[in-house]
């Protein structure tokens, strides 16, 4: 938050994607292309400043039964999906990665958000190469 990349709204801490020059690193689209609620059960988050903003820390969530919670400066809560992976990577692999890989379904928003928050925090390029693997579908 001190660097201006995050904001508090509705009890949660959000990453402000408008603060980045290059947010959509894996896709040739922009915020207007994003559709809210495309997936079943996903509701629009009216606390977000921009459609692509994402939660770094939850203190208010529709998941009341979330068991793992910790104290924070913003209240008891838990990390957002993307921050978990960035923290684990940095703790065990350091602040510069050569290669990061995952399924093609993680390119956006997951890996895009990992890059955004990691590079905002570190102040430098985080990962040199990204590999996104396609899925193999079979009949059985």
Give the location of each predicted region.
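Alpha-helical recognition segments enriched in aromatics with Gly/Pro capping
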Residues: 1-140
């Amino acid at each position: 938050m001190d660097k201006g990349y995050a904001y508090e709204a509705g009890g949660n801490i959000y990453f402000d994607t408008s603060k980045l020059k290059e947010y959509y690193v894996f896709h040739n689209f922009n915020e207007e292309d994003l559709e809210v609620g495309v997936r079943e059960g996903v509701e629009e988050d009216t606390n977000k400043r921009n459609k692509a903003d994402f939660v770094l820390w939850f203190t208010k969530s529709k998941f009341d039964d979330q068991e793992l919670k910790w104290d924070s400066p913003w209240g008891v809560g838990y990390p957002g999906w993307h921050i978990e992976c960035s923290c684990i990577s940095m703790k065990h692999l350091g602040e510069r990665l050569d290669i990061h890989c995952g399924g093609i379904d993680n390119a956006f928003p997951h890996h895009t958000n990992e890059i955004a928050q990691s590079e905002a925090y570190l102040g430098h390029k985080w990962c040199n190469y990204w590999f996104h693997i396609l899925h193999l579908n079979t009949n059985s």
